[in-house]
Amino acid sequence: MAPARGRFLLTLHSHLPLVLGHGRWPHGSDWLCEVTAGCYLPLLEVFERLAADGRRDLATLTLSPVLCEQLAHPSYRPEVETFLEGRLRSARENRGQFEAAGEDALAALTRVWEAEYGRLLARFRALDGDVLGAFRRLAAAGVVELITSAATHGYLPLLGREESVDLQLRLGAASHARHFGAAPRGAWLPECGYRPRYEWSPPAGPLRGKVRRRRRGIEEHLARLGLRYFVTDAHLLRGGEPYSAYRDYYPALRTVAAGADQPAYQRDRTPYRPYLVASRGGEGAAAVFTRDPRTTLQVWSRELGYPGDGRYLEFHKKHAPGGIRYWRVT
């Protein structure tokens, strides 16, 4: 048998801010229901099918704490059922509208969506609305590994107090243990944000530049909680300019990121191996895995990746009324 050339670690991070209790559209529970129908239920189907074939250790998944609290909330199931039932009605109503307008191709697509939403509704009811429980069972069977994130997805390097960083991670780990029945071994840092131990001064306010104090490295907080690894971006490993999917299209972002155009120190480090992170003078260490830059472009770039590929649905164009997507990327 030929020696293994390497290992591939598929890591999927999922987060949604608190939307339950804030209406339905445009930034209320519809957002949570859409991602349930378009992501969580299909993902569960794939993992369960592979598990039935005896496959294990398929992926590492992060369901952020604030997302888990919503998936476990009593209002989640009725909201999703109402959403899917509404989409079924919309597909039927849209078909009549398209047929009356002579849009035969669009009318045919309504049948595809009617079948899909009907299947998803049946699948959701078969789970008794317990999406978290389905992921928990997969983790218990060794099909996937579940890790945690910061409690409210706060950007840890910019939090001004050590207590804030500690509580974000401590409550995130506690939420994970409560929902999944086991302590997490790793964490996805929000926006892959990391900083080492260093002398810190308030970046704004009356004390800006006037006081300095030693701040712990993020890895020290992780180690205190038994979190053994985290994920970061390639530019934090090697230096250089971070990739931005939006900066070239929004002048305000170019202004904010003007400093990134300056030459940056780069180190000869490969993102295709793990590293142990420890700050000089710190207490505790954690391993780090680095996101593959090419995969990042595939996911986020509209020039090189899925957002600009005509074989995929146009995310931002929906039919009104009803909210169903019938158009591809153009």
Which residues fall in each region the model found?
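Short, solvent-exposed turn/loop segments enriched in Gly/Ser/Thr/Pro and often Arg
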Residues: 62-67, 150, 186-193, 235-236
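Generic, well-ordered alpha-helical scaffold segments in large soluble proteins
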Residues: 46, 50, 168-175, 179, ...
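A short acidic (Asp/Glu
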Residues: 20-23, 70-75, 157-161, 192-220, ...
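Beta-sheet entry/capping signal
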Residues: 6-9, 56-60, 144-147, 173, ...
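Generic recognition of stable, solvent-exposed alpha-helical segments in well-folded globular domains
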Residues: 38, 42, 164-167, 171, ...
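Active-site cores of enzymes that catalyze phosphoryl transfer or operate on phosphate-rich substrates
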Residues: 3-7, 12-16, 87-160, 165, ...
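Trp/Phe/Arg-rich N-terminal binding region typifying the photolyase-homology
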Residues: 3-107, 124-135, 158, 162, ...
